[in-house]
Each structure stands twice: as C-alpha cells, then as structure tokens.
C-alpha cells in the first residue's frame, strides 16, 4: 500500500515517481524469464473460481486492497491484513500461495507476488464472464506493510460520495474510474455488519422490499458475518447489473447507493446501466490505472520466495 503525501509538493513528487515506475512495466516482462507465468496464473485462478465462484470476487477485492499501492503488501501475514477494512474479510491468500509455489518450481524467484495478484484479478473477471485487458508486468514485492495506511487510504462501506471521490483522487483516479471500479460489486458478497445500518433505517434511499428481504439473514443484533450478494440479479456473473440495481435503489452498501442519489455521478451510473460496453471499457481502463499505482520496479523491494513473508 502506497503512502499518502504530506503536502502538495510531495504529492507531485509521488505522482511523478509513480508515473516513472509504471513506465518501467511491460506486458512482455516474463516472456523470456518465465514464459509460462501467465498460463500458470490463469489455470490456478480458473480452478479456484470453478470450485468456488465467490473466489473470483475475493481475488479482485484482494487486488483492490493491495493496489492503493500495488506491492503485495496485503499478502504479508499480519500488519495490513489486520487493518479495519481487511480484518476478517479478505480471502484468496491460499490461491495466490498455490500459484506462487507452482511458479517457484519452474521459475525460481522470478515472478513477483504483486504481479501474480494483479494478473489473478484480471483472470478472475474473465472467468466470470467479464472483459479482459493487457496487464503491464514487472512489479516487485514490498518488504513492509502498514495497517495504519490501509485504515487511512481504503474507502469503507459507509463512505459518502465525497469521501469516495477524495480517496480515489488521492490515488490519481478520477470520478469515472471510481464509478467503474465500484462496478466490481457486480460479484461477491458483503457481511451483515457492513449493511445493517442501511437496512434498518439508516438510509432512506433503499427499496423497501429489498431492505425487508435482507433482514431475514441480517438481524438487528448478531449475525455480523452473515453474507448477502452485492448483486442480487446475477451474483456470479461479471456484468453491468450492479448499476441497474442502483437505479432501483437496490445497492447493498451505503457506499454503493451514494453513486446514484441525486449526485454528480448519476449520469455515469445511468450510462453504465444501459451500455455494458461503456462499463467494460471504463472498467478495464480504471483497472490498468489502479494496477499502476506506485509499483516497486527495478531494484526496489524484492521478489518474495513466499507471498506471506519477506525473504530472510
């Protein structure tokens, strides 16, 4: 996870460094050093998603929570994993570890955990019927992680639109990027504790029948980890139904529905709801931008032997 800037000057420097670093990434990075890398990642993801369709959303979320600074810091045991937005909810570590073990057996200390996670996120979307995109490669792995930075950088389920925009802008992602990346909630589930307030009177911008249906598995007390689909229409398909849900006030999280609530983002939501191709194009563009946030390249960081711990 990349560190936030302390001043306008440092922000300019960080953006410049991030741009320079992303320029060192290349889609052909492993063509010679580990030519089967992408095939191995795709195979590992396909098997995992076939066994558990929810795993696709979990890997995509894992990438998002790492890629407010794409350095595989979120994969390190403890620290960042214990941050509020992550604790008890991140999944997919075993899938990444298995892929890493396979790659280490054929390409010793060559393919970074950061790249594995970035490619796995893309392959998860594809496995669930979503669009594909070319992933620039060559990231290296961090040797540290920070729970405090995760707490301060990652938006939460109760975030307002302005809070979401501020969090994304901090990472050089614009409002369209924000709305497009939120569309990842077309797959996956959320815990009751993250939407309880919304369905029990905390929000007025919610479909009454939708709220009632959610209460059956999310009581006012207890059941914090009970799950509900983020997209009730097509929960295991990566499509644009998320935005259709928002038009009907059926966004599961407060941070979902604020994107369509007499806000400046309303027209973008309408566009994505009616035009799947527009959503796919914006989503892939935003994913590439997010994957290029402050990567470690060259001699920075390391190539971990195990994704869960730094090299000894």
UniProtKB/Swiss-Prot annotation:
Binding-site positions, heme b: 185
GO CC terms of this entry: extracellular region
Cofactor note: Binds 2 calcium ions per subunit. Binds 1 heme b (iron(II)-protoporphyrin IX) group per subunit.
Cofactor: Ca(2+); heme b
GO biological process: hydrogen peroxide catabolic process; response to oxidative stress
Position of the signal peptide: 1-23
Site (Transition state stabilizer): 61
Location relative to the cell: Secreted
A Pfam family per the record: peroxidase
Primary localization: secreted
Binding site for Ca(2+) 2: 186, 231, 234, 239
Gene Ontology MF term list: heme binding; lactoperoxidase activity; metal ion binding
EC number: 1.11.1.7
Reactions catalysed: 2 a phenolic donor + H2O2 = 2 a phenolic radical donor + 2 H2O
Binding-site positions, substrate: 155
Cystine connections: 34-107, 67-70, 113-307, 192-218
Record has Magnesium as a keyword: no
Record family assignment: Belongs to the peroxidase family. Classical plant (class III) peroxidase subfamily.
Protein name in UniProt: Peroxidase
Organism listed in the record: Triticum aestivum
């Amino acid at each position: 996870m990349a560190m936030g800037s302390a001043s306008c000057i440092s922000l300019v420097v960080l953006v410049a460094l991030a741009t320079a670093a992303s320029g060192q990434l290349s889609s052909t990075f492993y063509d010679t050093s580990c030519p089967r890398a992408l095939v191995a990642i795709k195979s590992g993801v396909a098997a995992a998603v076939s066994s558990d369709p929810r795993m696709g959303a979990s890997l995509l979320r894992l990438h998002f929570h790492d890629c407010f600074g794409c350095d595989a810091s979120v994969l390190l045991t403890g620290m960042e994993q214990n941050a509020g937005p992550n604790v008890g909810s991140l999944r997919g570590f075993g899938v990444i570890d298995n892929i890493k073990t396979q790659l280490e057996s054929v390409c010793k200390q060559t393919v970074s955990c950061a790249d594995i996670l970035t490619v796995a996120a893309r392959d998860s979307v594809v496995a669930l019927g979503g669009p594909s995109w070319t992933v620039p490669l060559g990231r290296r792995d961090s040797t540290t992680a920070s729970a405090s930075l995760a707490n301060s950088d990652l938006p939460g389920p109760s975030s307002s639109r302005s809070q979401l925009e501020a969090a994304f802008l901090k990472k050089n992602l614009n409002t369209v990027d924000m709305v497009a990346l939120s569309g990842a909630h077309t797959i996956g589930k959320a815990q009751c504790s993250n939407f309880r307030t919304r369905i029990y009177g905390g929000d007025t911008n919610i479909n009454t029948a939708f709220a009632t249906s959610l209460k059956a598995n999310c009581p006012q007390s207890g059941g914090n980890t009970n799950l509900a689909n983020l997209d009730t229409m097509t929960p295991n398909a990566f499509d644009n139904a998320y935005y259709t849900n928002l038009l009907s006030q059926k966004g599961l999280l407060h941070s979902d529905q604020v994107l369509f609530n007499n806000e400046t983002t309303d027209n973008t939501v309408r566009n994505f709801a009616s035009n799947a191709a527009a959503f796919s194009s914006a989503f892939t563009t935003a994913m590439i931008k997010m994957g290029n946030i402050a990567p470690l390249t060259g001699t920075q960081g390391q190539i971990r032997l195990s994704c869960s711990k730094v090299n000894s």
